[in-house]
């Protein structure tokens, strides 16, 4: 199940490293990073290892520097059923901290402020029958141009090539969007944003359901689309509730760990 999503996320992961021919495990696909050429952000941090696991078959994508492959495989074996809990992630940080320093790097371990690692949850569906159609509201509208309605309060990143938004007095107050052309893609990643004064009113759920229903409808514009995914942070409980209320299923989780150079 979700084979197209697995290909989509693996392809995205390959943009951050070099696919390896090494067979770690029949269920683990490896992407290697070069520790001397990590991409550091403006704060001086870079992702040193990340892993993603699909729930239907337990398969994983791992991208890391070669020096960490064996320790991470041992970790996967030890915590196979609990890879995403605070307990297991803290254990991993503590046990790899010294190894990281040998390579001129230091792990970001600010656990008190929850900045030591970043979690992501992927929801999705392949079938429009999974969707809670009863959650749709009459004020959800489909539109393409962000200039068609008043979108005051939304950053440009929340204006997609295709949008389903809640329209109140000619103003969009909640918007579900995708930024990839549905004419050319089998997997569409959608997002949702709602203005603060309009949250907890069911608008987000209505827009997500309407967007996913259309993308999976088989209409000419979206006839290539096979799967819809919805990505959110592991700490964003309200966003996860929106996904579940829409009828989307939790299909995968990812966790990313950061490092910086020792100066």
Give the ranges of each region predicted by the language model.
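Conserved acetyl-CoA-binding loop-helix of GNAT-fold acetyltransferases
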Residues: 190, 194, 200-217, 241-245
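A conserved beta-strand-loop-helix scaffold within acyl/acetyltransferase catalytic domains
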Residues: 156-162, 167-187, 191-195
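Conserved catalytic-core motifs of GNAT/GCN5-like acyltransferases
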Residues: 115-124, 247-263
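Conserved G/P- and acidic residue-centered "switch" motifs that form tight phosphate/ATP-binding loops
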Residues: 170, 202, 236
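Conserved active-site alpha-helix within GNAT-family acetyltransferase domains
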Residues: 205, 233-252
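Short, basic/aromatic recognition patches
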Residues: 144-161
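Acyl-donor-binding surface of acyltransferase catalytic domains
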Residues: 2-148
């Amino acid at each position: 199940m979700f084979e197209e999503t697995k290909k989509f996320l693996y392809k995205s992961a390959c943009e951050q490293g070099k696919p390896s021919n090494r067979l770690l495990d029949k269920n683990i696909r490896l992407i290697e990073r070069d520790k001397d050429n990590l991409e550091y952000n403006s704060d001086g941090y870079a992702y040193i290892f990340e892993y993603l696991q699909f729930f239907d078959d337990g398969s994983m994508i791992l991208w890391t520097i070669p020096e960490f492959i064996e320790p991470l495989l041992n970790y996967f074996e030890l915590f196979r059923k609990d890879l995403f809990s605070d307990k297991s992630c803290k254990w991993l940080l503590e046990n790899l901290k010294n190894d990281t320093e040998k390579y001129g790097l230091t792990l970001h371990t600010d656990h008190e402020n929850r900045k030591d690692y970043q979690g992501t949850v992927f929801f999705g569906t392949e079938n429009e029958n999974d969707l809670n159609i009863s959650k749709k509201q009459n004020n959800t509208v489909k539109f393409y141009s962000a200039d068609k309605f008043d979108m005051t309060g939304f950053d440009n990143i929340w204006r997609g090539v295709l949008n389903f938004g809640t329209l109140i007095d000619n103003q969009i107050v909640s918007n579900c969007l995708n930024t990839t052309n549905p004419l050319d893609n089998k997997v569409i990643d959608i997002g949702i944003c709602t203005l603060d004064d309009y949250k907890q009113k069911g608008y987000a759920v209505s827009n997500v359901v309407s967007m996913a229903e259309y993308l999976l409808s088989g209409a000419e514009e979206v006839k290539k689309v096979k799967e819809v995914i919805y990505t959110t942070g592991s700490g964003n409980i309200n966003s996860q509730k929106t996904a579940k209320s829409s009828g989307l299923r939790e299909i995968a989780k990812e966790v990313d760990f950061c490092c910086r150079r020792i100066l």
